[in-house]
């Protein structure tokens, strides 16, 4: 099937030295298995990690020490990563999941997306809803929050960039962009079909959309789960909204 096992330390502060060593050994034994965890969402958490792992220079160094930074390793948040830590992510091939609704809900701050993806040490970033503290599983609402996060750094996020994060960007971060994340011959065709006029407000606003870019921007700012008209998994329809 398409399901995969994932090596998942809850996060460094709740993991013992022995647990992390065992997970690192497992990662070394199975180099193609994804790794998923959490890093640098808030400042108190970072101080906690420093107290628990005094022999490590910073938060990312903890995961690096145990062999848990590598391609297909995805870490949620990363709001407060230093330049040195971003360099470690770049060099190792590890990636970030940007979870803006969680960050806003907890008052943790917001990710400076362009700082992560541009420059001479780019890091792959996908868009995530989070589970415990995320406020919506709608990717449209998550794109809305990502736009606001970018605005808080004075670096606007275009509709094209947001939709990339939610599709191809996520696939790149997970190391599966050869299978999903774009519409092309040979891809596995995991698709969400959007109704651009799914609510009375969207129907009204779309009358004034001048081009595709504006139409997509309207969806990410005003849309929610009601916009999803149908979904396909591996080319097979698995959901269709009732008329």
Model-derived features with residue positions:
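Short, flexible, mixed-charge acidic loops at enzyme active sites
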Residues: 51-56, 137-142, 207
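C-terminal cap of metal-dependent C-N hydrolases
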Residues: 188-242
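His/Asp/Glu-enriched, well-ordered alpha-helical/loop segment
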Residues: 65-72, 114-204
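Short, acidic/turn-prone active-site loops that include or flank metal/cofactor-
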Residues: 41, 100-104, 131-132
């Amino acid at each position: 099937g398409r399901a995969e096992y994932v090596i998942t330390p809850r996060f460094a502060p709740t993991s013992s030295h022995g647990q992390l060593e065992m997970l690192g050994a497992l990662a070394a034994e199975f180099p193609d298995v994804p790794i998923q965890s959490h890093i640098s969402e808030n400042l108190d958490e970072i101080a906690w990690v420093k107290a628990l792992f005094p022999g490590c220079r910073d938060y990312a160094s903890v995961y690096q020490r145990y062999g848990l930074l590598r391609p297909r390793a995805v870490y949620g948040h990363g709001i407060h990563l230093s330049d040195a830590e971003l360099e470690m992510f770049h060099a190792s091939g590890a990636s970030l999941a940007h979870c803006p609704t969680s960050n806003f809900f907890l008052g943790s701050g917001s990710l400076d997306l362009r700082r992560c993806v541009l420059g001479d040490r780019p890091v792959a970033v996908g868009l995530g809803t989070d589970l415990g503290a995320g406020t919506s599983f709608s990717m449209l609402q998550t794109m809305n929050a990502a736009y606001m996060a970018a605005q808080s750094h004075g670096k606007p996020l275009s509709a094209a960039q947001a939709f990339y994060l939610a599709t191809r960007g996520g696939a790149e971060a997970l190391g599966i962009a050869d299978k999903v994340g774009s519409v092309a011959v040979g891809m596995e065709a995991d698709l969400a079909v959007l109704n651009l006029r799914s609510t009375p407000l969207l129907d009204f606003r779309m009358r004034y959309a001048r081009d595709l870019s504006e139409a997509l921007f309207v969806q990410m700012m005003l849309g929610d789960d009601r916009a999803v008209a149908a979904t396909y998994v591996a080319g097979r329809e698995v959901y269709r909204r009732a008329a």
